[in-house]
């Protein structure tokens, strides 16, 4: 055999001549090297057989004896190498098993030791196989000696301060192979070993799992009390429980150890539909307790629904508070109608409110704050007409000082006497202002003599009442009046605690189309803030917005400050008390309870027919009645009209107020009036377009008024059968304001489009904003382009001005009307 053939044969058998020639030492074998060597050898064998077969098939005819001998020698060498490799593999496996058994006997944790190298006889370059595998780190002799000594020692208990590592070394010793040639792990056949990265990770996870098992076993063996957590539904029901009116399903679920959904379901089975957040009354809670078979006891506490009692307690606590500060005085201007109350207030505020009021009289309470010489004064302007007696009474109750206006040329009148009585019953001081001193017929001495009959004696006559002669029109005596107001306030030592919860009184209330229920409130103690949960009379809510008397939104309102608030669930009554509660839940419960009490009182006031009152009932039913559906712009006006109608005394006829409310006249009002054959009276409000057409179809009479005594006179005349009008108001056109211009010496010019009908220069005109009449007057001028015209018909633009009114805005509706004669018959 030539040298070249020998080299080729050596390469085919996987032998490296450079590594094996001249060496007669020990051959280090690892499991991975053996396995790779076997695979490579097997591959070499198959390749050699394939080449041999191909060679024999292709060149069988040309085969020479030398080639046959060479092939025979190669096969013999292959068989010899296979036998030798099998013996070496078996020896390595046996050695590894011995080391494993020895490590398990010496220590509790498996320690993988390095398998000693297997001696291999020296081979020639042609005989040594080529084995490739991972490089095996050879430990130092000192390390081997230490490992051997540790394996012979008995296993020591791990110290409590430092636990031994449970991770085995993955590179110190090869893993053995099973009969199928696959590596096994921890004695489990068919699993991969720990030489690859994946095997090392799985080994680490296995060790961590063993650590967790040992830790759990240790905790289980230790005497430890395990915390038991029981669910709410598994806990037994109490024998009895204490409840409060207003609790919801969630609150009851916590007490009864039941889920809120179960409470809702049980009440549903009992015929009561609720949700988890709805407040429950006493009967519902007791019914639920009876169904569970337990006793329910109502918690005894102070009646928080008694707003008047809470209001009185808060007022008393504020007097003894250490946080009291000086507050502005609340001054109410009272007197007879048309004696100059609003004119005086206009002089103080530098405004012209009285010019915009229908008939020149005030018909609701207005609250304003005026700063005079760095001092704030809150003024309340009350109506002077006889119909507004309740408004004057409310003004006297919430005021500190009453300024009584008496006209010098008119003297004491009925409403003047009524104002004196209201002030005396409220126990507030009175300052008399004798107005209209600029008129020729002014006689202040006569007025003084008249007032002395009602125990109002001036200081110069030895009394204690302050008298001031003024002229609201010219400004005479105004400074002296203000000085006396401030002096009287200082003597009263008016103080309040701004840190306590706010309390106040409703001055006026109404329903706004864009804002909803609106209440004008005077804060008397504490500070009201946006977001506070409040109860106002029978209504409740959370303060959404607050607006001061100048129309600016504010975040808080201090004592003696009038504000307009929104956020209530309904329109409150005038003179209702406002109280702030800790949370909205309590406020809701109190408001609902008060509404229920009010409804119960209304039911109790219904007079049922009995044998005792049968005759009176028959007599009353035989009387003729004027049924009225009453709608007004504010709550106070509706209340005043209803009281005035009830006071009309006509024999054989009575007034029956079917419904009273605030806001524009709508379809529901027309339907109610049609069903009951009633008359609709609107005070400073207008019907909607749908309501107007429905009323025309159903023949419902709608009467609109802006002055209260005209409404009272018409109702009285109708009751007496004397209402035979010779003139009737007829709407002749409707306009929409598209633009406005302000021109000096002229005022505000409205550019309007005539939607239907027509408008003339002599027609009356009403300004309607959001369904409420803002002004009723006459057309001052009417133009098309630059020409004055007498009439503008539908479909054309025009420019017009209104007498004594400049507060015209884009989007306002204008209603043109004429008074036409009605022919009898």
UniProtKB/Swiss-Prot annotation:
Residues 360-364 are annotated as: G2. CDD domains: IF2_eIF5B, IF2_mtIF2_II, mtIF2_IVc. This is Translation initiation factor IF-2. Residues 471-473 are annotated as: G5. GO terms for molecular function: GTP binding; GTPase activity; translation initiation factor activity. InterPro entries: EF-G-like_DII, IF2_II, IF2_N, P-loop_NTPase, Small_GTP-bd, T_Tr_GTP-bd_dom, TF_IF2_bacterial-like, TIF_IF2. It is found in: Cytoplasm. GTP binds at residues 335-342, 381-385, 435-438. One of its GO terms (cellular component) is cytosol. Residues 181-191, 211-220 have a biased composition (Basic residues). The gene is infB. Residues 1-19, 35-45, 70-98, 113-122 have a biased composition (Basic and acidic residues). Keywords: Cytoplasm, GTP-binding, Initiation factor, Nucleotide-binding, Protein biosynthesis. Residues 1-239 are annotated as: Disordered.
């Amino acid at each position: 055999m030539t040298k070249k053939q020998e080299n080729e044969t050596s390469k085919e058998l996987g032998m490296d001549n450079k590594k094996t020639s001249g060496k007669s030492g020990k051959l280090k074998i690892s499991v991975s090297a053996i396995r790779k060597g076997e695979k490579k050898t097997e591959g070499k064998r198959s390749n050699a057989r394939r080449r041999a077969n191909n060679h024999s098939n292709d060149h069988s005819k040309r085969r020479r004896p030398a080639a046959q001998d060479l092939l025979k020698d190669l096969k013999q060498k292959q068989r010899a190498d296979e036998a030798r490799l099998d013996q070496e593999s078996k020896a390595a496996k046996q050695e590894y098993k011995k080391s494993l058994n020895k490590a398990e006997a010496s220590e509790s944790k498996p320690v993988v030791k390095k398998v000693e190298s297997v001696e291999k006889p020296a081979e020639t370059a042609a005989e040594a196989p080529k084995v490739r595998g991972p490089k095996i780190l050879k430990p130092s002799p000192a390390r081997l000696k230490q490992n051997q000594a540790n394996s012979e020692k008995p296993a020591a208990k791990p110290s409590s301060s430092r636990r031994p590592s449970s991770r085995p070394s993955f590179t110190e010793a090869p893993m053995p192979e099973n009969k199928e040639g696959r590596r096994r792990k921890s004695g489990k056949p068919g699993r991969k070993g720990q030489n690859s990265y994946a095997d090392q990770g799985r080994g680490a996870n296995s060790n961590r799992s063993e650590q967790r098992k040992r830790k759990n076993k240790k905790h289980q063996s230790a005497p430890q009390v395990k915390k038991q957590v029981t669910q709410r539904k598994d806990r037994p029901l109490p024998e009895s429980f204490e409840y409060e009116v207003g609790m919801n399903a969630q609150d009851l679920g916590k007490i009864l150890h039941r889920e809120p959904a179960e409470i809702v379901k049980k009440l549903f089975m009992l015929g009561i539909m609720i949700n988890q957040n709805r407040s429950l009354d006493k009967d519902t809670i007791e019914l639920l307790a009876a169904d569970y078979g337990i006793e329910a006891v109502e918690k005894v506490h102070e009646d928080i629904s008694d707003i008047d009692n809470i209001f009185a307690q808060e007022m008393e606590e504020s007097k003894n508070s250490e946080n009291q500060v000086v507050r502005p005085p609340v001054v109410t201007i009272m007197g007879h109608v048309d004696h100059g109350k609003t004119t005086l207030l206009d002089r103080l505020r530098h405004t012209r409110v009285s010019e915009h009021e229908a008939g020149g009289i005030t018909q609701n309470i207005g609250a304003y704050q005026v700063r005079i010489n760095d001092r704030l004064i809150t003024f309340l302007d009350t109506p002077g007409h006889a119909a507004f007696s309740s408004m004057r009474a409310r003004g006297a109750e919430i005021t500190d000082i009453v300024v009584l206006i008496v006209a010098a040329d008119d003297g004491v009148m009925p409403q003047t006497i009524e104002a004196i009585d209201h002030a005396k019953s409220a126990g507030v001081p009175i300052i008399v202002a004798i107005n209209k001193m600029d008129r020729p017929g002014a006689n202040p001495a006569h007025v003084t003599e008249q007032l002395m009959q009602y125990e109002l004696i001036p200081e110069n006559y030895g009394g204690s009442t302050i008298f001031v002669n003024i002229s609201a029109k010219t400004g005479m005596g105004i400074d002296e009046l203000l000085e006396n107001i401030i002096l009287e306030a200082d003597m009263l030592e008016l103080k309040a605690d701004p840190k306590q919860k706010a309390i106040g009184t409703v001055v006026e209330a109404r329903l706004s189309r864009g804002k909803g229920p609106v209440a004008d409130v005077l804060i008397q103690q504490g500070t009201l803030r946006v977001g506070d949960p409040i109860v106002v009379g029978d209504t409740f809510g959370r303060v959404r917005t607050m607006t001061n008397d100048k129309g600016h939104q504010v975040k808080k309102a201090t004592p003696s400050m009038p504000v307009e608030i929104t956020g209530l669930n309904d329109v409150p009554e005038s003179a209702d008390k406002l109280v702030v509660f800790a949370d909205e839940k309590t406020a809701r419960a109190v408001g609902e309870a008060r509404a229920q009490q009010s409804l119960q009182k209304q039911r109790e006031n219904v007079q049922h027919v009995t044998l005792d009152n049968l005759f009176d009932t028959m007599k009353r039913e035989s009387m003729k009645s004027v049924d009225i559906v009453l709608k007004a712009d504010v709550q106070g006006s509706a209340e005043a009209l209803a009281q005035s109608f009830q006071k009309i005394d006509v024999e054989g006829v009575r007034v029956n107020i079917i419904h009273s409310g605030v806001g524009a006249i709508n379809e529901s009002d027309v339907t109610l009036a049609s069903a009951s054959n009633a008359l609709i009276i609107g005070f400073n409000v207008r019907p909607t377009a749908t309501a107007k057409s429905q009323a025309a179809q159903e023949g419902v009479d709608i009467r609109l008024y802006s002055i209260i005594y005209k409404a009272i006179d018409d109702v009285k005349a109708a009751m007496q059968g004397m209402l035979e009008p010779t003139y009737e108001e007829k709407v002749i056109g409707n306009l929409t304001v598209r633009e406005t211009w302000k021109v000096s010496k002229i005022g505000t010019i409205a550019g309007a489009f005539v939607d239907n009908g027509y408008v003339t220069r002599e027609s009356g005109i009403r300004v309607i904003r959001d369904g409420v009449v803002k002004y009723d007057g006459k057309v001052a001028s009417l133009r098309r382009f630059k020409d004055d015209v007498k009439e503008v018909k539908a479909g054309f633009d025009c420019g017009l001005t209104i007498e004594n009114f400049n507060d015209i805005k884009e989007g306002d509706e204008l209603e043109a009307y004429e008074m036409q004669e009605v022919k009898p018959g």
